[in-house]
Amino acid sequence: MADLMSDTYEYSSLANKYGNFYLPAVKIYINGTDILAAQKLFLEEISVVLSLDSAGSAQFKIGNIYDPPSRSFKSGIADKFKPGTIVEIALGYYSSTTKIMKGFVYMLGAEFGNKNLLVVTVMDVRKLMMIGGSRHVLHNVKNYSDIFKTIMSAYSRLCTPKVSATNDKLEAPVSQTGTDYDFIMDELVKKGKSDREFFVLGENAYFRERPKSAPAVLKAEFGRELLELEMDYSYLDMEIQVMGYNSYEQASYIGKSKVKSGEPQASLLTPTPVFAYSDPDADNQEKAARRAGAIADLADRQSKNGRLTMIGLPEIVPGRYVEVVKLEKMVNRKYYITEVRHRIGGAFFVTECDIGGFA
Protein backbone atom coordinates (compact mmCIF):
# COMPACT_ATOMS: atom_id res chain seq x y z
CA MET A 1 0.00 0.00 0.00
CA ALA A 2 1.29 3.46 -0.89
CA ASP A 3 2.49 5.71 1.91
CA LEU A 4 0.79 8.99 1.10
CA MET A 5 2.95 10.86 3.62
CA SER A 6 6.30 9.92 2.08
CA ASP A 7 5.98 8.54 -1.46
CA THR A 8 6.68 10.78 -4.47
CA TYR A 9 5.12 10.46 -7.91
CA GLU A 10 5.69 11.36 -11.54
CA TYR A 11 2.81 12.58 -13.68
CA SER A 12 3.50 9.89 -16.27
CA SER A 13 3.32 7.07 -13.71
CA LEU A 14 0.03 8.38 -12.30
CA ALA A 15 -1.42 8.74 -15.81
CA ASN A 16 -0.47 5.13 -16.47
CA LYS A 17 -1.88 3.94 -13.14
CA TYR A 18 -5.18 5.77 -13.62
CA GLY A 19 -5.77 5.23 -17.34
CA ASN A 20 -5.09 8.86 -18.28
CA PHE A 21 -7.65 10.07 -15.72
CA TYR A 22 -10.73 9.36 -17.87
CA LEU A 23 -13.21 7.52 -15.64
CA PRO A 24 -13.34 8.43 -11.92
CA ALA A 25 -13.92 5.61 -9.48
CA VAL A 26 -15.03 5.46 -5.84
CA LYS A 27 -15.00 2.62 -3.36
CA ILE A 28 -16.72 2.86 0.02
CA TYR A 29 -15.74 0.10 2.41
CA ILE A 30 -17.77 -1.13 5.37
CA ASN A 31 -16.24 -4.07 7.25
CA GLY A 32 -13.78 -4.54 4.39
CA THR A 33 -16.45 -4.78 1.66
CA ASP A 34 -17.02 -2.20 -1.06
CA ILE A 35 -20.65 -1.48 -0.31
CA LEU A 36 -21.25 0.29 -3.63
CA ALA A 37 -20.25 -2.77 -5.63
CA ALA A 38 -21.78 -5.31 -3.26
CA GLN A 39 -25.19 -3.59 -3.21
CA LYS A 40 -24.97 -2.30 -6.82
CA LEU A 41 -25.52 1.27 -5.65
CA PHE A 42 -25.37 4.33 -7.91
CA LEU A 43 -23.18 7.10 -6.50
CA GLU A 44 -24.48 10.48 -7.62
CA GLU A 45 -21.56 12.50 -6.22
CA ILE A 46 -18.98 12.59 -3.45
CA SER A 47 -16.82 15.26 -1.84
CA VAL A 48 -13.97 14.53 0.57
CA VAL A 49 -12.29 17.22 2.68
CA LEU A 50 -8.96 16.45 4.35
CA SER A 51 -7.41 19.10 6.57
CA LEU A 52 -4.59 19.82 9.00
CA ASP A 53 -6.72 22.26 10.99
CA SER A 54 -10.17 20.68 11.30
CA ALA A 55 -11.92 17.33 11.21
CA GLY A 56 -11.86 15.55 7.87
CA SER A 57 -15.23 14.91 6.25
CA ALA A 58 -16.88 13.24 3.31
CA GLN A 59 -20.38 13.54 1.95
CA PHE A 60 -21.78 11.24 -0.68
CA LYS A 61 -25.19 10.93 -2.28
CA ILE A 62 -26.72 7.67 -3.45
CA GLY A 63 -29.38 7.66 -6.15
CA ASN A 64 -31.73 5.20 -7.86
CA ILE A 65 -32.78 3.57 -4.58
CA TYR A 66 -36.15 5.29 -4.09
CA ASP A 67 -39.18 3.19 -5.05
CA PRO A 68 -42.20 5.43 -5.87
CA PRO A 69 -44.88 2.69 -5.62
CA SER A 70 -43.84 1.80 -2.07
CA ARG A 71 -42.83 5.39 -1.28
CA SER A 72 -39.63 4.29 0.39
CA PHE A 73 -35.96 3.65 -0.19
CA LYS A 74 -35.07 0.09 -1.10
CA SER A 75 -35.14 -2.16 1.93
CA GLY A 76 -32.04 -2.22 4.10
CA ILE A 77 -29.96 0.34 2.20
CA ALA A 78 -30.25 3.16 4.74
CA ASP A 79 -29.44 0.72 7.54
CA LYS A 80 -26.04 0.07 5.96
CA PHE A 81 -25.13 3.68 6.72
CA LYS A 82 -26.59 4.18 10.18
CA PRO A 83 -24.70 6.75 12.30
CA GLY A 84 -21.67 5.26 14.02
CA THR A 85 -20.84 2.88 11.17
CA ILE A 86 -17.10 2.85 10.41
CA VAL A 87 -16.35 3.66 6.77
CA GLU A 88 -13.24 3.79 4.57
CA ILE A 89 -13.17 5.73 1.30
CA ALA A 90 -10.94 5.20 -1.73
CA LEU A 91 -10.79 7.40 -4.84
CA GLY A 92 -9.18 6.91 -8.23
CA TYR A 93 -9.98 5.96 -11.80
CA TYR A 94 -11.22 2.77 -13.44
CA SER A 95 -10.31 -0.15 -11.16
CA SER A 96 -7.35 1.58 -9.51
CA THR A 97 -8.16 3.47 -6.29
CA THR A 98 -6.26 4.79 -3.27
CA LYS A 99 -7.67 4.84 0.27
CA ILE A 100 -7.59 8.35 1.68
CA MET A 101 -10.07 8.42 4.56
CA LYS A 102 -11.31 6.38 7.49
CA GLY A 103 -14.10 7.69 9.67
CA PHE A 104 -17.60 7.08 10.95
CA VAL A 105 -21.05 7.96 9.68
CA TYR A 106 -21.88 11.14 11.52
CA MET A 107 -25.09 12.11 9.74
CA LEU A 108 -27.68 10.38 7.57
CA GLY A 109 -30.29 12.26 5.59
CA ALA A 110 -32.29 12.45 2.37
CA GLU A 111 -32.97 14.87 -0.47
CA PHE A 112 -36.17 14.80 -2.54
CA GLY A 113 -36.63 16.89 -5.68
CA ASN A 114 -35.47 16.33 -9.24
CA LYS A 115 -33.47 13.46 -7.79
CA ASN A 116 -34.32 11.41 -4.73
CA LEU A 117 -31.13 10.77 -2.82
CA LEU A 118 -29.82 9.18 0.35
CA VAL A 119 -27.20 11.56 1.81
CA VAL A 120 -24.39 10.22 4.01
CA THR A 121 -21.89 12.37 5.92
CA VAL A 122 -18.70 10.77 7.26
CA MET A 123 -16.29 12.44 9.71
CA ASP A 124 -12.85 11.36 10.84
CA VAL A 125 -11.81 10.66 14.44
CA ARG A 126 -11.25 14.34 15.22
CA LYS A 127 -15.01 14.94 15.13
CA LEU A 128 -15.51 12.21 17.72
CA MET A 129 -12.84 13.89 19.84
CA MET A 130 -14.78 17.17 19.58
CA ILE A 131 -18.12 15.72 20.66
CA GLY A 132 -16.81 13.25 23.22
CA GLY A 133 -17.35 15.63 26.12
CA SER A 134 -15.04 17.58 28.39
CA ARG A 135 -12.40 15.83 30.44
CA HIS A 136 -10.66 16.94 33.61
CA VAL A 137 -7.41 15.00 33.74
CA LEU A 138 -3.90 15.38 35.13
CA HIS A 139 -1.42 13.79 32.72
CA ASN A 140 1.51 12.66 34.85
CA VAL A 141 4.05 11.82 32.14
CA LYS A 142 7.42 13.16 31.03
CA ASN A 143 6.66 14.22 27.45
CA TYR A 144 3.84 15.81 25.47
CA SER A 145 4.04 13.01 22.93
CA ASP A 146 3.18 10.58 25.75
CA ILE A 147 0.07 12.63 26.51
CA PHE A 148 -0.93 12.36 22.85
CA LYS A 149 -0.54 8.58 22.89
CA THR A 150 -2.60 8.33 26.07
CA ILE A 151 -5.43 10.41 24.65
CA MET A 152 -5.53 8.63 21.28
CA SER A 153 -5.64 5.16 22.86
CA ALA A 154 -9.37 5.73 23.42
CA TYR A 155 -9.94 5.97 19.65
CA SER A 156 -8.22 2.78 18.48
CA ARG A 157 -11.23 1.65 16.41
CA LEU A 158 -10.79 4.63 14.12
CA CYS A 159 -7.07 5.32 14.01
CA THR A 160 -3.51 4.31 14.88
CA PRO A 161 -1.22 6.99 16.36
CA LYS A 162 1.92 7.86 14.38
CA VAL A 163 4.02 9.90 16.79
CA SER A 164 7.25 11.86 16.54
CA ALA A 165 8.46 11.64 20.13
CA THR A 166 9.16 14.83 22.07
CA ASN A 167 11.79 15.22 24.79
CA ASP A 168 10.15 17.63 27.21
CA LYS A 169 11.19 16.26 30.63
CA LEU A 170 8.09 17.66 32.27
CA GLU A 171 8.56 18.41 35.95
CA ALA A 172 4.87 18.51 36.92
CA PRO A 173 1.59 16.95 35.75
CA VAL A 174 -0.15 18.69 32.86
CA SER A 175 -3.78 19.63 33.42
CA GLN A 176 -6.36 18.94 30.74
CA THR A 177 -9.78 20.57 30.78
CA GLY A 178 -12.14 20.48 27.84
CA THR A 179 -12.35 18.05 24.95
CA ASP A 180 -9.49 15.88 23.74
CA TYR A 181 -9.41 17.75 20.43
CA ASP A 182 -9.28 21.21 21.99
CA PHE A 183 -6.57 20.18 24.42
CA ILE A 184 -4.29 18.80 21.70
CA MET A 185 -4.87 21.64 19.24
CA ASP A 186 -4.99 24.57 21.64
CA GLU A 187 -2.59 23.54 24.38
CA LEU A 188 -0.05 21.31 22.62
CA VAL A 189 0.01 22.68 19.06
CA LYS A 190 -1.10 26.31 18.82
CA LYS A 191 0.67 27.47 21.98
CA GLY A 192 3.91 25.96 20.78
CA LYS A 193 4.35 23.58 23.72
CA SER A 194 5.38 20.99 21.18
CA ASP A 195 6.60 21.75 17.67
CA ARG A 196 4.18 19.24 16.22
CA GLU A 197 1.24 18.99 13.84
CA PHE A 198 -1.83 16.94 14.67
CA PHE A 199 -3.85 15.63 11.77
CA VAL A 200 -5.50 12.47 10.48
CA LEU A 201 -5.03 10.75 7.15
CA GLY A 202 -6.63 7.42 6.41
CA GLU A 203 -6.33 5.21 9.45
CA ASN A 204 -3.38 7.12 10.94
CA ALA A 205 -3.43 9.98 13.46
CA TYR A 206 -0.20 11.96 13.14
CA PHE A 207 1.59 13.95 15.84
CA ARG A 208 4.71 14.90 13.97
CA GLU A 209 7.29 17.60 13.45
CA ARG A 210 6.33 20.23 10.93
CA PRO A 211 8.44 19.66 7.81
CA LYS A 212 10.17 22.93 6.90
CA SER A 213 11.27 21.27 3.69
CA ALA A 214 10.57 17.83 2.29
CA PRO A 215 10.35 16.11 -1.09
CA ALA A 216 7.28 17.24 -3.04
CA VAL A 217 4.63 14.60 -3.61
CA LEU A 218 4.48 15.77 -7.24
CA LYS A 219 5.97 18.32 -9.64
CA ALA A 220 2.97 20.04 -11.21
CA GLU A 221 2.86 21.88 -14.53
CA PHE A 222 0.24 24.47 -15.45
CA GLY A 223 -2.02 23.20 -18.23
CA ARG A 224 -1.21 19.58 -17.42
CA GLU A 225 -2.32 18.44 -13.95
CA LEU A 226 -2.36 22.01 -12.58
CA LEU A 227 -5.50 23.86 -13.69
CA GLU A 228 -5.47 27.01 -11.52
CA LEU A 229 -3.11 28.66 -9.03
CA GLU A 230 -3.44 31.59 -6.63
CA MET A 231 -0.68 32.58 -4.19
CA ASP A 232 0.26 35.55 -2.05
CA TYR A 233 2.56 36.45 0.80
CA SER A 234 2.08 39.26 3.30
CA TYR A 235 4.29 41.64 5.27
CA LEU A 236 5.84 39.89 8.27
CA ASP A 237 8.35 41.33 10.73
CA MET A 238 7.99 40.48 14.43
CA GLU A 239 9.65 38.98 17.47
CA ILE A 240 7.97 36.24 19.51
CA GLN A 241 8.73 36.08 23.22
CA VAL A 242 7.62 33.21 25.46
CA MET A 243 7.87 33.80 29.20
CA GLY A 244 8.11 30.86 31.58
CA TYR A 245 8.79 30.33 35.26
CA ASN A 246 10.33 27.55 37.35
CA SER A 247 8.81 27.61 40.84
CA TYR A 248 11.40 25.19 42.23
CA GLU A 249 14.31 27.34 41.11
CA GLN A 250 12.34 30.58 41.48
CA ALA A 251 13.72 31.60 38.11
CA SER A 252 12.05 33.13 35.07
CA TYR A 253 12.94 32.47 31.45
CA ILE A 254 12.28 34.30 28.20
CA GLY A 255 12.56 32.55 24.86
CA LYS A 256 12.86 34.76 21.79
CA SER A 257 12.46 34.11 18.07
CA LYS A 258 12.40 36.69 15.30
CA VAL A 259 10.37 35.94 12.21
CA LYS A 260 10.54 37.92 8.99
CA SER A 261 9.19 37.19 5.56
CA GLY A 262 11.72 35.43 3.40
CA GLU A 263 10.29 37.33 0.45
CA PRO A 264 11.41 40.83 -0.64
CA GLN A 265 9.96 43.50 1.66
CA ALA A 266 10.85 46.85 3.26
CA SER A 267 11.11 47.14 7.05
CA LEU A 268 8.70 49.68 8.52
CA LEU A 269 9.11 49.62 12.32
CA THR A 270 12.16 50.00 14.57
CA PRO A 271 12.56 48.26 16.91
CA THR A 272 10.91 45.06 15.72
CA PRO A 273 7.38 44.64 17.18
CA VAL A 274 7.24 42.13 20.05
CA PHE A 275 4.39 39.68 20.71
CA ALA A 276 4.60 38.11 24.17
CA TYR A 277 3.12 34.83 25.41
CA SER A 278 3.06 33.33 28.89
CA ASP A 279 3.59 29.59 29.33
CA PRO A 280 3.84 28.15 32.86
CA ASP A 281 5.20 24.86 31.46
CA ALA A 282 8.25 26.59 29.94
CA ASP A 283 10.32 25.95 33.06
CA ASN A 284 13.77 26.28 31.49
CA GLN A 285 15.45 28.33 28.79
CA GLU A 286 15.43 25.57 26.19
CA LYS A 287 11.67 25.05 26.45
CA ALA A 288 10.93 28.76 26.30
CA ALA A 289 13.13 29.16 23.21
CA ARG A 290 11.64 26.11 21.50
CA ARG A 291 8.09 27.33 22.03
CA ALA A 292 8.93 30.78 20.76
CA GLY A 293 10.37 29.15 17.65
CA ALA A 294 7.26 27.03 17.13
CA ILE A 295 4.96 30.06 17.33
CA ALA A 296 7.23 31.98 14.95
CA ASP A 297 7.17 29.11 12.44
CA LEU A 298 3.38 29.06 12.55
CA ALA A 299 3.24 32.82 11.94
CA ASP A 300 5.54 32.41 8.93
CA ARG A 301 3.32 29.73 7.41
CA GLN A 302 0.17 31.75 7.99
CA SER A 303 1.67 34.70 6.09
CA LYS A 304 1.98 32.62 2.91
CA ASN A 305 -1.29 31.52 1.37
CA GLY A 306 -2.87 30.36 -1.82
CA ARG A 307 -4.96 27.79 -3.62
CA LEU A 308 -4.30 25.14 -6.25
CA THR A 309 -6.85 23.44 -8.48
CA MET A 310 -5.72 20.21 -10.09
CA ILE A 311 -7.12 17.25 -11.94
CA GLY A 312 -8.40 14.69 -9.47
CA LEU A 313 -5.44 13.06 -7.72
CA PRO A 314 -6.00 11.10 -4.48
CA GLU A 315 -2.25 11.26 -3.83
CA ILE A 316 -2.57 14.98 -3.06
CA VAL A 317 -3.10 15.15 0.70
CA PRO A 318 -2.52 17.66 3.53
CA GLY A 319 0.89 17.68 5.15
CA ARG A 320 2.76 17.33 1.84
CA TYR A 321 4.38 19.75 -0.58
CA VAL A 322 3.39 20.18 -4.23
CA GLU A 323 6.08 21.76 -6.41
CA VAL A 324 4.98 24.04 -9.24
CA VAL A 325 7.47 24.14 -12.12
CA LYS A 326 7.84 25.82 -15.52
CA LEU A 327 5.40 28.67 -14.85
CA GLU A 328 6.79 31.99 -13.47
CA LYS A 329 9.74 32.76 -11.23
CA MET A 330 7.59 34.13 -8.41
CA VAL A 331 5.36 31.06 -8.29
CA ASN A 332 7.83 28.29 -9.18
CA ARG A 333 8.27 26.82 -5.69
CA LYS A 334 7.10 24.14 -3.27
CA TYR A 335 3.71 24.76 -1.64
CA TYR A 336 2.71 23.23 1.69
CA ILE A 337 -0.79 21.78 1.53
CA THR A 338 -3.03 22.40 4.55
CA GLU A 339 -6.40 21.31 3.16
CA VAL A 340 -7.54 19.21 0.21
CA ARG A 341 -11.01 18.96 -1.29
CA HIS A 342 -11.64 16.06 -3.67
CA ARG A 343 -14.89 16.24 -5.68
CA ILE A 344 -16.29 13.56 -7.97
CA GLY A 345 -19.53 13.77 -9.91
CA GLY A 346 -20.24 11.85 -13.09
CA ALA A 347 -17.18 12.03 -15.35
CA PHE A 348 -15.32 14.80 -13.49
CA PHE A 349 -12.85 14.52 -10.62
CA VAL A 350 -11.23 17.71 -9.33
CA THR A 351 -8.80 18.27 -6.44
CA GLU A 352 -8.57 21.69 -4.79
CA CYS A 353 -5.83 22.53 -2.27
CA ASP A 354 -5.31 25.31 0.25
CA ILE A 355 -1.73 26.52 0.74
CA GLY A 356 -0.30 27.30 4.17
CA GLY A 357 3.33 28.19 3.58
CA PHE A 358 5.84 27.58 0.83
CA ALA A 359 9.51 27.05 0.28
Task: State where each predicted segment sits.
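Assembly/oligomerization scaffold segments
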Residues: 1-125
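An acidic/polar, Gly/Ser/Thr-rich interaction patch typically located in mid-to-C-terminal regions
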Residues: 48-80, 225-359
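Conserved "cap/hinge" positions at secondary-structure junctions
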Residues: 91, 209, 326-328
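Short, compositionally biased
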Residues: 102-111, 211, 335-347
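Short polybasic amphipathic segments
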Residues: 23-32, 204-206, 240-245
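Amphipathic, non-transmembrane alpha-helical segments in extracytoplasmic/periplasmic proteins
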Residues: 20, 59-60, 122, 133-162, ...
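Short beta-strand-centered interaction patches in the first periplasmic/extracellular domains
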Residues: 2, 6, 107, 115-127, ...
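Short solvent-exposed strand/turn elements
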Residues: 65, 116-132, 349-359
